[in-house]
């Protein structure tokens, strides 16, 4: 057996011809052709949505090969040092718990966007490169290519643009805004960058 995983879950693959597994190692990207079958009732796996079916492999094509030993096991990536996880982020994102966090965040943002729109708010994006403004943290600055010695600041919050919109008559505005603050890490946000519903 092998477990075939994609964005949507895991499927058990039955290998009846051992030669199909020649050269196959963990975390390779595979294309498997075969026959989908119902599992015998005593082999059902209620822990996964595909637990009543399995794929009998007739052909396996390797789409992406693994040439080196993996730096960590995918299912335990959350226990690994953060610098290692970030270096191999493409592997860390294969961990179901990490993926589920990203999917959850996407659903929350979609929900907020729909709710605000339903209440008559207009979604407006404000500029990212702007003048520095007096906020609570230090600015991240971006040098101007055109104006030597001049700098843009990344917004700590879209406050000034929100006030411009309100003064212009946009009374129901929202955005899911990136905010950039050159400050130390906090328990509730990443150092330097976070998103907020404004």
Question: Where are each of the predicted segments found?
Answer:
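Class II aminoacyl-tRNA synthetase catalytic cores and aaRS-like
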Residues: 1-198
């Amino acid at each position: 057996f092998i477990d075939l995983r994609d964005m949507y879950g895991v499927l058990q693959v039955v290998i009846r011809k051992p030669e199909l597994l020649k050269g196959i190692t963990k975390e390779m990207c595979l294309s498997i052709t075969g026959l989908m079958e119902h599992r015998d009732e005593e082999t059902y796996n209620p822990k996964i949505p595909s637990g009543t079916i399995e794929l009998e492999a007739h052909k396996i094509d390797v789409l992406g090969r693994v040439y080196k030993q993996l730096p960590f096991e995918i299912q335990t990536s959350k226990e690994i040092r953060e610098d290692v996880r970030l270096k191999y982020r493409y592997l860390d994102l294969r961990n179901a718990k990490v993926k589920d966090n990203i999917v959850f965040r996407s659903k929350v943002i979609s929900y907020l966007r729909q709710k605000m729109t339903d209440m008559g708010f207009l979604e407006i994006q404000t500029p990212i490169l702007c003048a520095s403004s007096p906020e609570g943290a230090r600015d991240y600055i971006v040098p101007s290519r055109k104006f030597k010695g001049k700098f843009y600041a990344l917004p700590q919050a879209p406050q000034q643009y929100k006030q411009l919109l309100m003064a212009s008559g946009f009374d129901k505005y929202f955005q899911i805004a990136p905010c950039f603050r050159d400050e130390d890490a906090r328990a509730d946000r990443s150092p330097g960058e976070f998103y907020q519903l404004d």
